[in-house]
Amino acid sequence: MPVQAVCPYCGNRIITVTTFVPGALTWLLCTTLFLFGYVLGCCFLAFCIRSLMDVKHSCPVCQRELFYYHRL
């Protein structure tokens, strides 16, 4: 969820841009599903579920990363 902030790099008042990136929880679930014998690539479904991914917040003006939220 984007947040309103003042960018410490460019000084502008911004609403952050959020990007979902695979993190430890995503890889852990993928590995667990693979080890328990899920076939036909079902283990890769973890990469399609945003609530399992980490979130990167960045400034829309200077494109710098402001915060990284780790799910695990």
Swiss-Prot record:
UniProt-annotated binding residues for Zn(2+): 7, 10, 59, 62
GO CC annotations on file: cytoplasmic side of late endosome membrane; cytoplasmic side of lysosomal membrane; nucleus
UniProt entry keywords in alphabetical sequence: Membrane, Metal-binding, Zinc
InterPro entries xref list: LITAF, LITAF_fam
Predominant subcellular localization, coarse grouping: membrane
Source superkingdom: Eukaryota
GO molecular function: zinc ion binding
Biological process (GO), any one: regulation of cytokine production
UniProt keyword Metal-binding present: yes
Domain LITAF: 1-71
Chain spans, region Membrane-binding amphipathic helix: 22-45
Membrane topology field: Peripheral membrane protein
Coiled coil stretches, renumbered: none
Compartments, as annotated in UniProt: Membrane
Domain notes: The LITAF domain is stabilized by a bound zinc ion. The LITAF domain contains an amphipathic helix that mediates interaction with lipid membranes.
Family (UniProt): Belongs to the CDIP1/LITAF family.
PANTHER family cross-referenced by the UniProt entry: LIPOPOLYSACCHARIDE-INDUCED TUMOR NECROSIS FACTOR-ALPHA FACTOR, LITAF DOMAIN-CONTAINING PROTEIN
Protein name as catalogued: LITAF domain-containing protein
Species: Homo sapiens
Organism classification: Eukaryota, Metazoa, Chordata, Craniata, Vertebrata
UniProt gene name: LITAFD
